[in-house]
UniProtKB/Swiss-Prot annotation:
Organism: Methylibium petroleiphilum (strain ATCC BAA-1232 / LMG 22953 / PM1)
Record-given protein name: Urease accessory protein UreE
GO cellular component labels: cytoplasm
Keywords: Chaperone, Cytoplasm, Nickel, Nickel insertion
Pfam families, per the entry: UreE_C (PF05194), UreE_N (PF02814)
Amino acid sequence: MLTLNKLLARGAGLAPALLKRAATVELDWDVRQKSRFDATDSQGRALGVFLPRGSVVRGGDVLVAEDGSLVRVIAAPQSVLVVRHCSEHGSAFDLLRAAYHLGNRHVPLELQPDRLQLEPDHVLADMLRAMHLIVSEAQAPFEPESGAYGEAAAHGHGHAGHDHAHDHDHGPAQASTPAPTPRGRPVGVAIKAAAPAPHVHGPGCGHDHDHGSGHHH
């Protein structure tokens, strides 16, 4: 078994010729979100992958073996639900609204300019159809969005090496001298609570409304 314990995001730093000659391995999302797994590459070799905990493998990434061998990862086609807006009964904004509701449920979700993709779930499919969205089944690679803070560092986009501290020069007068108070005049600060914004049941409303509609897409 060939042991691979290093991950290069998108083959960073490798010459195109090396990437072209590298063996490949097709992995679906269920496998690629694991840090340890077994697989078989395009040359028929058994692979044992041991990556740091929390690693996520994306299509186009390159796994590096202990002996320096390279294996390029291909996101394998798998069953997905493809969600598109219905131009007859809605608008493209419905996709944004659907992404909001799916995100609240922590559903792994792939975002594309004209569609959403998620793993098959009949309950979610019914919910999306009730929102007047078109839901269909397909075989396609699945690359869900990563967490805002989770995967970026593993793929080299973190800011751990950057110093974001801001130095402010507060002179002695600024740091220790209070502003003078006018004599003979009380000091007070009027605090007025902001009036709550009226609730508008428009396309941006986050509530689910039962329209009693029998549309089927």
